[in-house]
Curated annotation (Swiss-Prot):
It is found in: Secreted. Belongs to the formicidae venom precursor-01 superfamily. Contains 1 disulfide bond. It comes from Myrmecia gulosa (Red bulldog ant). It comes from the Eukaryota. This is U-myrmeciitoxin(01)-Mg6a. One of its GO terms (cellular component) is extracellular region. Residues 21-33 form a propeptide. Expressed by the venom gland. The keyword Repressor does not apply. Its main location: secreted. GO terms for molecular function: toxin activity.
């Protein structure tokens, strides 16, 4: 495997991880945003 191929390989992994992980992280953040007020109001997880 030459350097150029290796760089494209790494870039592909990075893009795949970014595309996969960021929506999951965003979904978790949104869930926490909704969960937060519920915890304060009701005192338990929704």
């Amino acid at each position: 495997m030459n350097l150029k191929t290796f760089c494209f390989f790494l870039l592909g992994i990075f893009v795949t991880l970014t595309v996969t992980v960021i929506p999951i992280a965003n979904a978790d953040a949104e869930a926490d945003t909704f969960r937060g007020p519920c915890l304060k109001i009701k005192g338990y997880k929704c």
